[in-house]
Amino acid sequence: MEFYASLKSIAMHVPSERVKNAEFQQFLDTSDEWIEKRTGIKERRFANDEEKSSDLGVIAAKQAIERAHLTPKDIDLVVVATLSPDFLAMPSTACVLSAKLGIENKPAFDISAACTGFIYLLSVAKAYVESGMYENVLIVGAEKTSSVLDFKDRGTCILFGDGAGACVIGRTKRLKESILDVQISANGNFSNYLYTPRTLKPTPFNAKEEASEPFLCMKGNEVFKLAVKTLLKDVEMILEKNALKPEDVRLFIPHQANFRIIQAVREHLDFKDEQVVLTVHKYGNTSAASIPMAMGEAYEEGRLKKGDLMLLDAFGGGLTWGSALVYFGGS
C-alpha cells in the first residue's frame, strides 16, 4: 500500500444552553440524584428551535478543515452520521452541510447507524481514502437529539443531548499516524430495542390508524445488558487481532451513552483512569456525535497528541456496534 488513511484533524461544537438534571423535575417524576446515579449524567446541551443538526455540524466542520490546513474546496467527499437529520428523508444532512460550507459538485451522503455512526464513518472514510478514490474526506457526527425525544418519557429524554464533532481523514505513509483498524457489525433481529417509529402517513385508501409520533423509543434494560456484553467482546477482539494490550492504548474513548456501561468495559480491561475520556456527565448521550466530541475535547485539553493511539467503541440502534484503533495523525 502506498499510503494509509489518517485522522488529520478533529473539532467539536455544542450549543450554549445547559440543561441540568433538576430542570426535568418541572414536568417529570425524577430528580438530579436519580438521573446521575443511573447514568452518570449531570447536564446536557440543547440546541434552540432554529438550530438544526447541520448548523451544529458545520461549526465543527469548519474548525476541523482549518485544523487540517485545508479549505472547503479541498474536501473530496462529505459523509454525515445522524439520527436527527434536518429533513425526514431528503435531502441528506450531508448535502445541506456541504452547501453551508460552500462545497459544490462533490459527493455527500448520510449514514444511519445511530450511536455507532462515527465508527461507521471511520470505516467508510478509511475505505475511500485507501482505495485512492478520494484524498480528503470530511466526516461529521451531528445530532439534535432533542428534536426526536418524548419529554414525557423519563426513560429516554433525560439521557440525550445535542452537539457535533467533525474530522478530516486524509493520507499518510506512516503506519503510526493511520486509522489502524475498524470493525463494524449489526444485528437487525434486535431492531425493536432502540428505534424511532415510522412517521409516514398511511394512504386514505387503507388508513387504519394515525401515524406514530417520531419519538425515540428504547428498551433500556435490554439495551444495557446487550451493550456491555457486546462491547466487551468487540473491544477484546480488535485488540487481539492487532496484537495489542490495553496498556498500549494512550486513550480509550468510548461512546458516551451511560457511565455504568463505560465503567463495566473499563474495569474489565483494566484501563487506568488517565486513559479514559469521559464527557457523558456534561453532554449526555449525543449519539453519533459523542465520540468525535470526546476526541475533540481531549485534543483541546492537550490530552490527545500526534501519534497517540486511541481505542474507540460504540453501540447503538439497529442494533449496531463497532470499534476502532486510530493513531492521531494531526498536529
UniProtKB/Swiss-Prot annotation:
Reactions performed catalytically: malonyl-[ACP] + acetyl-CoA + H(+) = 3-oxobutanoyl-[ACP] + CO2 + CoA
Pfam families: ACP_syn_III, ACP_syn_III_C
InterPro entries in the record: ACP_syn_III_C, ACP_syn_III_N, FabH, Thiolase-like
Active site: residue positions: C115, H255, N285
Domain of life: Bacteria
GO terms classed as biological process: fatty acid biosynthetic process
Gene Ontology cellular component annotations, sorted alphabetically: cytoplasm
Annotated stretches, region: ACP-binding: 256-260
Record has Acyltransferase as a keyword: yes
Keywords: Acyltransferase, Cytoplasm, Fatty acid biosynthesis, Fatty acid metabolism, Lipid biosynthesis, Lipid metabolism, Multifunctional enzyme, Transferase
Pathway(s) it belongs to: Lipid metabolism; fatty acid biosynthesis
UniProt EC number: 2.3.1.180
Family annotation (CDD domains): KAS_III
GO molecular function: 3-oxoacyl-[acyl-carrier-protein] synthase activity; beta-ketoacyl-acyl-carrier-protein synthase III activity
Cellular location(s): Cytoplasm
NCBIfam families: fabH, PRK09352.1
Biological function: Catalyzes the condensation reaction of fatty acid synthesis by the addition to an acyl acceptor of two carbons from malonyl-ACP. Catalyzes the first condensation reaction which initiates fatty acid synthesis and may therefore play a role in governing the total rate of fatty acid production. Possesses both acetoacetyl-ACP synthase and acetyl transacylase activities. Its substrate specificity determines the biosynthesis of branched-chain and/or straight-chain of fatty acids.
Subunit architecture: Homodimer.
Domain notes per entry: The last Arg residue of the ACP-binding site is essential for the weak association between ACP/AcpP and FabH.
Family, per entry: Belongs to the thiolase-like superfamily. FabH family.
Annotated protein name in UniProt: Beta-ketoacyl-[acyl-carrier-protein] synthase III
Species this protein is from: Helicobacter pylori (strain ATCC 700392 / 26695)
